Amino acid sequence: MTGGRIYTHSLEKLMPGFAEEAPLERKVTKERVALMTETGVVNIEYASGKPDDANSASYTILRSKFDKWFAEKCEEVGVMMVPGIRVDSLLMDGDKVVGIDAAGEEMYADVVILADGVNSLLAQSIGLKPELKPEQVAVGCKEVIQLGEDVINQRFGVENGEGVSMLVAGDPTVGNIGGGFLYTNKDSVSIGIVATCSDIGRVDVSIPDMLERFKNHPAIEPLIKGGVPLEYSAHLVPEGGFDMIPKLYADGVLVTGDAAAFVINLGYTVRGMDFAVESGKLAAETVIRAKAAEDFSAASLSYYQKLFENSFIYADMKQYRNFPKLLERHEIFNDVPEIADVLFDRLFRVDGTKPVSLPMFAIDEIAKRTSAKKLLDLVMVALDAL
């Protein structure tokens, strides 16, 4: 499962021109970030109008279509795909991983690459990563709603092939840490909620109910009205950032993608698939090198760590390593949307009453909701995150 957007630069380097044949939905041409209260929304939209090159484009996708195409491409170059098998445990020879056990069937390999998601029980079983903490992960809940291509074009103000990405903080999660998202596909939309596990139970609203709340918001309901639900899914998402990255290698094993916590959430964008593609490529390069030397020890596979530390994954995640601390602040999901709502309401309201000084009005509203010390602390955390 994915929210529905892939930044294509890493896949473009691996498969130049792939976008010409891959089952991509729409190219993202409009970025929307919104602060939402129960009845209002403050929305920022950006559309550059500049042509994207292949390395800077991003697209919405549906994994059911995209993964099938991608698997077929892998098979074309000799990969044997074995879907539908649950790996129960790793086969060990002392401290060395030598294969997998799948429902009693043993499969041996020189190297096992773990890509089993953020809750990688396999990586935990050999001590590469600790058990997850609730504040390190979020639950993503998504629905795909059929609308029709022309309806999407009209409602979102786009042409055929053009798409919208929308990320929302505030009311969708009832002030919990997390947010809502909406991506336009060719003839459907992907809409969902992400809520940090440590906040579940903080309010008496379940994750599915949060999604319904989001869908019924006055700013969202007109966009999806009359749609037909096609699918429903849920997924655990890493939220801990750079400091959550585990040890990435051991004798006979490497860790990639979500299992390695290779995801960053910046509020205005969420990235994971481009990291997953790149980490898979780096793992493959490491195995090829190890095979040439017939050395699959931890010392040999540590080359993966070196490649990782010289990659854009490492650079991006290190740059924003303090962002999770900012997104742990409930003020962002409670006070900030409420303050933005009342400020913009005051800014645009014309009712014949005595005008007010907007700066003083803003100070007043902020003072009602938080102390100067807490506000200053939030500003300092934000500066540190950036």
Model-based region annotation:
Residues 1-40, 311, 315, 319:
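N-terminal FAD cofactor-binding segment of flavoenzymes
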Residues 170-177, 186, 199-279, 295-306, ...:
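FAD/FMN-dependent oxidoreductases across multiple families
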Residues 134, 138, 272-285:
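Gly/Ser/Thr-rich active-site loops/lids in small-molecule metabolic enzymes
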Residues 327-386:
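C-terminal auxiliary extensions adjacent to catalytic cores
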Residues 64, 68-69, 73-223:
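Predominantly flavin-linked oxidoreductase catalytic cores and closely associated redox partners
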Residues 20-24, 155-157, 225-227, 317-324:
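Short coil/turn segments at secondary-structure boundaries
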Residues 282-334:
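Active-site-proximal substrate-binding core of FAD-dependent oxidoreductases
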Residues 42-65, 194-197:
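Helix-loop-beta segment of a Rossmann-like dinucleotide-binding subdomain
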